[in-house]
Curated annotation (Swiss-Prot):
It is a multi-pass membrane protein. It is found in: Cellular thylakoid membrane. The 4 large subunits of the cytochrome b6-f complex are cytochrome b6, subunit IV (17 kDa polypeptide, PetD), cytochrome f and the Rieske protein, while the 4 small subunits are PetG, PetL, PetM and PetN. The complex functions as a dimer. One of its GO terms (biological process) is photosynthetic electron transport chain. Belongs to the cytochrome b family. PetD subfamily. This is Cytochrome b6-f complex subunit 4. PANTHER family: CYTOCHROME B. CDD domains: cytochrome_b_C. SUPFAM superfamilies: a domain/subunit of cytochrome bc1 complex (Ubiquinol-cytochrome c reductase) (SSF81648). GO terms for molecular function: electron transporter, transferring electrons within cytochrome b6/f complex of photosystem II activity; electron transporter, transferring electrons within the cyclic electron transport pathway of photosynthesis activity; oxidoreductase activity. It comes from Desmonostoc sp. (strain PCC 7906) (Nostoc sp. (strain PCC 7906)).
Length: 160
């Protein structure tokens, strides 16, 4: 049985830390043996059972045989490459498209240097990183949805 240490709420230093939002839960159950012997094996066995059940209930389908004389009108990449495909498809110059794709990781590398004065972990207290993340997520979704549409409707997503 695990021994739990209760916090002394009459301690002025602890009260000052809690008032600043610096409190952490150091007083819960230890990871050994509770999580390592009981929780982790259940999660691993449950995940394995779910994977086996999905493999049995929905086996992989083999597609129709390839016909080299009948190609589709527009060949689309896999779903995770839709945003990159849309960048290359919508920009008129190939070099401009490659530079736009290269600017994405470079911009992500620069985010920690832009906000290096802010040491908080809470996303609500890190406005630059949160704004960059939300903007990047929305642009990626917009590009990904637009890549599945025809070129004339792809930039407006067919709304206008």
């Amino acid at each position: 049985m695990a021994t739990q240490k209760k916090p002394d709420l009459s301690d002025p230093q602890l009260r000052a830390k809690l008032a600043k939002g610096m409190g952490h839960n150091y007083y819960g159950e230890p990871a050994w043996p509770n999580d390592l012997l009981y929780v982790f094996p259940i999660v691993i066995m449950g995940s394995f059972a779910a994977i086996v059940a999905l493999a049995v209930l929905d086996p992989a389908m083999t597609g129709e045989p390839a016909n080299p004389f009948a190609t589709p009108l527009e060949i689309l990449p896999e779903w995770y490459l839709y945003p990159v495909f849309q960048i290359l498809r919508s920009l008129p110059n190939k070099l401009l498209g490659v530079l736009a794709m290269a600017s994405v990781p470079l911009g992500l590398i620069l985010v920690p240097f832009i906000e290096n004065v802010n040491k908080f972990q809470n996303p609500f207290r890190r406005p630059v990183a949160t704004t960059v993340f939300l903007f990047g997520t929305l642009v990626t979704l917009w590009l990904g949805i637009g890549a599945a549409l025809p070129l004339d409707k792809s930039l407006t997503l067919g709304l206008f």
